[in-house]
């Protein structure tokens, strides 16, 4: 490779013909993608390659597979809420979900695991999920994503599965049912799915919007305060 420290030429110059410009830019992008697929751009990290691949997945999940996949929200590996749960660790949870899905799924359903963004530098479950999916003969039905927009995934999922993550409450906010496999503050009768996991895959699911509004109003009024561990919040005094 030559001509650039990044392994590809700079953006093509703009000419007077708009159509030719567009074609030239698209050809440049295609050349870059080809180099990525061949592993010829070492300056691009694995994360960048994953992002390119996942953007294509999102279109399918929001169209063809909308409301036909179950979203599994993974938590950080050392989350105390995981350590104190009914699961030994996150891999144990992953195995439990894949086994149940393989036994009870309907035709045309998919399972999507979403990695926790704060766990990106510490864990990667690619090989585990691939091995379990192959072992249980659901290899073509299981996806593992890292960087896709969580609210979009929640809105288009048939249901969300969590150990006890607060993602479950976000799922309810977006109108998507939640199956909580351990204890969570929002796991109350009439709000979350009160079914064993094996029964979830074939059940008719819905969110009681009135119940959600009542629980949300109570938590805002009695239980929650504005704050963040990660950034300052204007007006919160933090």
PLM features: residue spans?
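Leloir-type glycosyltransferase catalytic cores
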Residues: 1-36, 190-238
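A nucleotide-sugar donor-handling region in carbohydrate enzymes
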Residues: 1-80, 86
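Beta-sheet entry/capping signal
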Residues: 69-70, 108-110, 159-160, 177-178
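Short catalytic/ligand-binding loop motif for oxyanion handling, primarily in non-cytosolic enzymes
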Residues: 79-82, 119-122, 170, 187-190
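Catalytic donor nucleotide-activated moiety binding site of glycosyltransferases and closely related
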Residues: 102-144
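A donor-sugar binding/catalytic signature common to diverse glycosyltransferases
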Residues: 146-192
